[in-house]
Structures are given as C-alpha cells and as structure tokens.
Regions:
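Extended, charge-rich alpha-helical interface modules
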Residues: 2-95
C-alpha cells in the first residue's frame, strides 16, 4: 500500500499529509487520502456490525444446544478473527 502520510517523529503518533493527496472544495475536503480514510471507516463499521450479528447467531445456536456443530465453530472462528483485528486497531488508538 502506498502511504499518504509521513510520521512527524518516531516517538509520536502524529502524521502529516502532502497537499497533493487532498483538495478543498465548498463541501469540505476530497482526494485519494480522504477516499482511503472513508473506506477504512466503512471497514471498521462493518467489523463492528459483523461482531454484533455473529454474537446473535452464536447465542441462537447456544439456545438450540448446537455448540458442537460445524456452524457454531465456524461462526466462533470468524468472531475471534474479527476480535483480533479490532484489538489490533485499539492498540493503535482506533476505537
């Protein structure tokens, strides 16, 4: 992935963005960096929503006594993967 930002210092989580990656218009800012940020935010929201759906599906299977089923284990695996991704993002201050 091509980076649009550069760290100001190695100790801080402060970044700068080149002007060529964004432009201002009457509605705000646009450009490749803004588009990438928007996609990232969509992915993050989708992960949160998926976790909620998975939790509901797992609870339904638990109530049916199907905790040993292939479907339950597959959904649990997906939930754990999503949880690890969200945990990594939280490590970097993204919540």
């Amino acid at each position: 992935m091509e980076r649009f930002t550069q760290k100001k210092t190695s100790q801080e989580r402060k970044y700068v963005l080149g002007e060529q990656e964004i432009t201002q218009n009457p509605y705000g800012y646009t450009g490749a960096a803004v588009d990438r940020l928007g996609v990232f935010e969509d992915v993050f929201e989708d992960l949160i929503a998926a976790q909620e759906r998975l939790a509901a599906q797992l609870e339904e299977l638990r109530l049916q006594g199907k905790t040993k089923s292939y479907q339950f284990r597959e959904l649990m695996g997906k939930k754990l993967v999503n949880s690890n991704v969200l945990s990594l993002l939280r490590t970097y201050g993204i919540q």
